[in-house]
Design a protein with these regions (language model features):
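N-terminal, polar/charged subdomain of small-to-medium soluble alpha/beta proteins
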Residues: 1-100
Length: 100
């Protein structure tokens, strides 16, 4: 798995990196059967919004198109959990379209 992590407005700590890798494990199980090389680009950002100060975005390429999932919220770790669930759901949907 190739993983590119970019942050804006915050330090990328080892705990955040581990949380991102853990969050992508669910999606990795789905993509292993679809592609020989998984490539995920993850962007995390601390915004100026008091309601939703954290933004996370995951981009991956599957079935000749880019799949982009974006979430925001008050807690970065909760946002990472939400975005990983959303990404897994979208990947399953794409897999069913092409293999069922």
């Amino acid at each position: 798995m190739r993983l590119e992590i970019t942050s804006k407005g915050m330090d990328l700590t080892p705990a955040i990196k581990n949380s991102i890798e853990k969050a992508l494990q669910k999606s990795l199980k789905i993509t292993k059967s679809l592609s020989s090389e998984e490539h995920f680009k993850v962007f995390v950002e601390k915004t100026n919004s008091p309601e939703e100060p954290f933004l996370a975005k995951i981009v991956t390429h599957i079935f000749k198109k880019d799949l982009v999932v974006t979430k925001s919220g008050k807690d970065l770790y909760a946002v990472l959990d939400l975005i990983s669930d959303d990404l897994a759901r979208h990947l399953r949907k794409e897999k069913e379209k092409h293999y069922v």
